[in-house]
């Protein structure tokens, strides 16, 4: 059969090469029963096939690749002579001929042909961002614009990465099926669990991680689940300590051999030099009965999930109970002449009492009287006395209903609170999380031990990072990098499965674009309440001038918007999870931040042991102040009044808005103890 005119697919054969049988067939025709009669070139015999087993496709469409890209299994393909698309209903199959004469047949799900180049999305947005990179990008020692070079490496035809939607593509962001089992080898709480689930089921997800809420822990759990599914992961940040923190936590669990810390030339060179040509011994990671541990992890996740739901419900019920008691108190004062005939309403469901109360209040407002049918209906539901009270004194009956509702709802909440509290006490959340963490980590290590069998390991050169990217990512599925170097870590024909962008509030828009171009999915992590990236006055003038020239949407304003802020406004359909549980500061310190900046949404998980002066203000007296970026009076107060009180009480940190002030303090104290808000942000100090 002519493979350019028809395609015969044997659906019973799962392997790509075996299921396409066109070139093996001499003739094909339909039998009277509706099946297929086939004669192969290798035999004169005629074989009969069930109709459902074979697809006989004709009239292929020649695909025009002009201004389009071809990607097979997410790898960019060049040197294509011809693409034929065979279609039937929702199924597509491709026959691809390369310029060297080689041909291959592929399932449609393995082939992606782009629609519109991403530089054509969103009007002038791409040109604007590229201009920002050209005019304000960081330069290396040889005065080469690093950012502009990164922009030139972006594959503009690849429109199935999040950058496309960021630039204005109206295509809906993809969602993914939830994995059958999600693992938490680094521990979890309610909001971290929600953040991990959102990351695994959405092309783009955003995690707001205020300080001390376990942001790194959440990132590690996402990485672990992606590793279990054999995905490649790029972790980027403008802050070196953020990616190093991820590396350290992975090393603590013996997983550092999966990590390649790349980015700039120095890091790449160090990685190449330090490669170990064999795998670590992972025999002890292999489980004799992984199914038992898997079942335990599943059971513990179900218990923990229920307990998280219980905790949330407990908090809601407590809030409702407190509000109800306050309402009841004022209602009792107002209805001092409560009708005593309400005992018969005891133990009636509060929802029914509220329903009738709303009906009665509406009738009073509309000066109506209840019909006989309505009175009979409610007397049937709540009891016979309802009939006479509805027909006689409606206002008095409203007072009875109000009192009965408060008593009924109060009793219901108390029962629910008691049941949930008992359940939480019985299950022991802390113990269950420990068992979930332990079993998850065992399964992760078991899977890795099975995948990376001990023995010799491939050693890569700098060129291999580009030319053998697929093989490299199988060996090192976790790559760490600066955001600036996001798309220079592997060859341009490849992208990562996921990019995780940490400290996104400190990344500027033009740099964040690079990271969105080099992965199929993005997890954007930051905190829009923290300080954004610093924009100098000189840079702001240049940025505003460029924006005025291109007239772009304000969501791309590089002066007023960090990358995180832009993403929050652009990716409206992406889930945003706030990590609420705070583990670092004293409750009084975090509660100040909570009320001032986080609308009371954070939950302190630390204990207030009644310490004195946890948070205090020291006012300086008049004299020797400066109006600029240096203040000698404040330095004197710090040295003479503040430090003597805390010098023997653990580590200290001094934060000041200005670098000049920090340098002066460090010079006088002869130690690196003071820094600016930007430098300290995200660092951990016991006292500061």
What are these regions (language model features)?
Residues 168-258, 468-523:
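Secondary-structure-rich domain cores
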Residues 98, 129, 142, 264, ...:
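Flexible glycine-/small-residue-rich
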């Amino acid at each position: 059969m002519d493979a350019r005119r028809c395609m015969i697919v044997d659906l019973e054969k799962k392997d790509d090469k075996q299921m396409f049988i066109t070139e093996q067939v001499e003739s094909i025709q339909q039998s009277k029963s509706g099946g297929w009669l086939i004669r192969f070139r290798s035999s004169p015999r005629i074989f009969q096939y069930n109709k459902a087993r074979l697809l006989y496709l004709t009239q292929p469409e020649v695909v025009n690749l002009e201004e389009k890209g071809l990607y097979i299994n997410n790898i960019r393909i060049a040197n294509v002579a011809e693409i034929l698309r065979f279609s039937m209903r929702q199924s597509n199959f491709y026959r691809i001929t390369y310029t060297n004469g080689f041909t291959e047949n592929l399932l449609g799900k393995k082939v992606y042909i782009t629609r519109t180049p991403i530089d054509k999305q969103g009007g002038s947005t791409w040109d604007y961002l590229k201009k920002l990179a050209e005019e304000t990008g960081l330069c290396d020692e040889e005065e080469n614009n690093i950012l502009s070079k990164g922009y030139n490496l972006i594959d503009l035809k690849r429109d199935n990465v999040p950058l496309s939607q960021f630039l204005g593509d109206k295509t809906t962001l993809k969602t993914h099926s939830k994995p059958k089992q999600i693992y938490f080898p680094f521990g979890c709480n309610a909001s971290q669990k929600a953040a991990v689930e959102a990351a695994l089921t959405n092309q783009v997800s955003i995690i707001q991680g205020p300080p001390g809420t376990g942001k790194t822990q959440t990132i590690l759990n996402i990485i672990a689940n992606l590793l279990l599914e054999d995905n490649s992961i790029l972790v980027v940040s403008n802050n070196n300590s953020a990616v190093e923190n991820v590396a350290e936590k992975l090393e603590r669990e013996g997983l550092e051999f999966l990590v390649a810390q790349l980015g700039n030339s120095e890091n790449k060179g160090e990685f190449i030099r330090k490669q170990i040509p064999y795998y670590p011994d992972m025999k002890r990671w292999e489980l004799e009965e992984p199914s038992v541990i898997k079942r335990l992890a599943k059971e513990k996740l179900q218990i923990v999930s229920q307990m998280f739901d219980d905790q949330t419900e407990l908090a809601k019920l407590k809030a409702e109970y407190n509000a109800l008691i306050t309402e009841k108190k004022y209602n009792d004062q107002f209805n001092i002449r409560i009708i005593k005939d309400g005992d018969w309403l005891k133990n009636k469901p509060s929802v029914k009492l509220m329903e009738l109360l709303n009906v009665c209040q509406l009738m009073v407002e509309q000066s109506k009287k209840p019909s006989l049918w309505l009175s009979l209906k409610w007397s049937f539901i709540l009891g016979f006395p309802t009939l006479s009270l509805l027909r006689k004194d409606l206002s008095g009956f409203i007072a009875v209903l109000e009192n009965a509702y408060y008593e009924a709802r109060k009793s219901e909440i108390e029962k629910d609170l008691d049941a949930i509290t008992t359940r939480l006490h019985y299950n022991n959340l802390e113990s269950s999380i420990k068992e979930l963490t332990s079993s998850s980590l065992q399964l992760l290590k078991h899977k890795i031990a099975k995948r990376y069998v001990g023995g010799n390991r491939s050693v890569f050169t700098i060129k291999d990072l580009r030319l053998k990217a697929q093989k490299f990512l199988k060996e090192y599925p976790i790559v760490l990098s600066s955001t600036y170097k996001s798309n220079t870590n592997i060859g341009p024909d490849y992208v990562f499965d996921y990019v995780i962008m940490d400290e996104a509030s400190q990344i500027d828009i033009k740099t964040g674009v690079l990271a969105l171009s080099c992965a199929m999915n993005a997890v954007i992590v930051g905190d829009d309440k923290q300080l954004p990236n610093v924009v100098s006055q000189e840079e702001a003038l240049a940025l505003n001038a460029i924006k005025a020239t291109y007239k772009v949407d304000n969501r791309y304003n590089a002066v007023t918007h960090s990358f995180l802020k832009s993403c929050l406004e652009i990716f409206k359909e992406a889930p945003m999870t706030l990590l609420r549980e705070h583990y670092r500061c004293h409750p009084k310190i975090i509660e100040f931040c909570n009320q001032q900046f986080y609308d009371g949404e954070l939950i302190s998980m630390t204990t207030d042991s009644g310490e004195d002066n946890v948070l205090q203000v020291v006012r300086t007296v008049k004299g020797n102040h400066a109006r600029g970026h240096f203040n000698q009076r404040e330095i004197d107060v710090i040295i003479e009044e503040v430090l003597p009180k805390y010098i023997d009480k653990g580590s200290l940190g001094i934060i000041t808005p200005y670098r000049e002030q920090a340098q002066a303090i460090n010079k006088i104290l002869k130690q690196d103890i003071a820094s600016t808000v930007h430098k300290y942000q995200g660092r951990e100090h016991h006292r500061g």
